[in-house]
């Protein structure tokens, strides 16, 4: 049975047969729920703790 994965950027659960799998040169596997998460992490190098729409967001200052 396929397992439910978790997005490497926002922390959202990814249902089976959906999402994007990215494999780095060192062999580590990253799962993304959307192209928005993939671009934010890999291309734009954003910190998920600073974005309100992620589960790891830290509010306040």
Curated annotation (Swiss-Prot):
PROSITE patterns in alphabetical order: RIBOSOMAL_L24E
InterPro entries in alphabetical order: L24e/L24_sf, Ribosomal_eL24, Ribosomal_eL24-rel_arc, Ribosomal_eL24-rel_N, Ribosomal_eL24_CS, TRASH_dom
GO molecular function: rRNA binding; structural constituent of ribosome; zinc ion binding
Cofactor(s), by name: Zn(2+)
GO biological process: translation
Annotated CDD domains: Ribosomal_L24e_L24
Keywords, sorted A to Z: Metal-binding, Ribonucleoprotein, Ribosomal protein, RNA-binding, rRNA-binding, Zinc, Zinc-finger
Cofactor comment: Binds 1 zinc ion per subunit.
Pfam annotation, one family: Ribosomal_L24e
UniProt zinc finger (C4-type) residues: 7-37
GO cellular component annotations of the record: ribonucleoprotein complex; ribosome
Residues that bind Zn(2+): 7, 10, 33, 37
Subunit structure of this chain's protein: Part of the 50S ribosomal subunit. Forms a cluster with proteins L3 and L14.
Family the UniProt entry places it in: Belongs to the eukaryotic ribosomal protein eL24 family.
Function: Binds to the 23S rRNA.
Name of this protein: Large ribosomal subunit protein eL24
Species annotation: Sulfurisphaera tokodaii (strain DSM 16993 / JCM 10545 / NBRC 100140 / 7) (Sulfolobus tokodaii)
